[in-house]
């Protein structure tokens, strides 16, 4: 069963606009990945394929900064700090995963093993499980 938008907003801590932004980035990434995998864009590097995710992370960070400033102005300092910490933690872990995966795909180095690449995702899943228990 799929989650409702309200549940996603509560569990992830993202606003509806941010969720739409990340889903749009996933759609564009999927198209670029298909083009790269099928050989229609052989000159496109893996860094270019991941640009939608990097852009979505940057825009989400910008949006979070705006929301944090607004919450501080409204006097809700505790909520502002908690939201800022939570969103920046999620975005940082996601960004680290994307960077490590791009580096592995470009260089094919043996120093980057997949356990190391997936470790930010494992940490993120643990944090999301704790947050889901706290919210409900």
From Swiss-Prot:
One of its GO terms (biological process) is intracellular calcium ion homeostasis. The keyword Transmembrane helix applies. Keywords: Endoplasmic reticulum, Membrane, Transmembrane, Transmembrane helix. It is found in: Endoplasmic reticulum membrane; Endoplasmic reticulum-Golgi intermediate compartment. The keyword Transmembrane applies. The chain crosses the membrane at residues 14-34, 50-72, 81-101, 112-132. Pfam families: Tmemb_185A. This is Transmembrane protein 203. It comes from Xenopus laevis.
């Amino acid at each position: 069963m799929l989650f409702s938008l309200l549940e996603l907003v509560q569990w992830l801590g993202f606003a509806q606009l941010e969720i739409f932004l990340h889903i749009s980035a996933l759609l564009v990434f999927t198209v670029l990945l298909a083009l790269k995998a099928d050989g229609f864009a052989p000159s496109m590097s893996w860094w270019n394929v991941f640009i939608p995710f990097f852009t979505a992370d940057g825009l989400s960070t910008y949006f979070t900064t705006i929301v944090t400033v607004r919450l501080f102005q409204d006097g809700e300092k505790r909520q502002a700090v908690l939201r800022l910490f939570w969103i920046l933690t999620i975005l940082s872990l996601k960004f680290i995963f994307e960077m490590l995966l791009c580096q592995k795909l470009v260089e094919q180095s043996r120093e980057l093993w997949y356990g190391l690449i997936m470790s930010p995702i494992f940490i993120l899943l643990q944090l999301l499980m704790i947050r889901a228990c706290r919210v409900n």
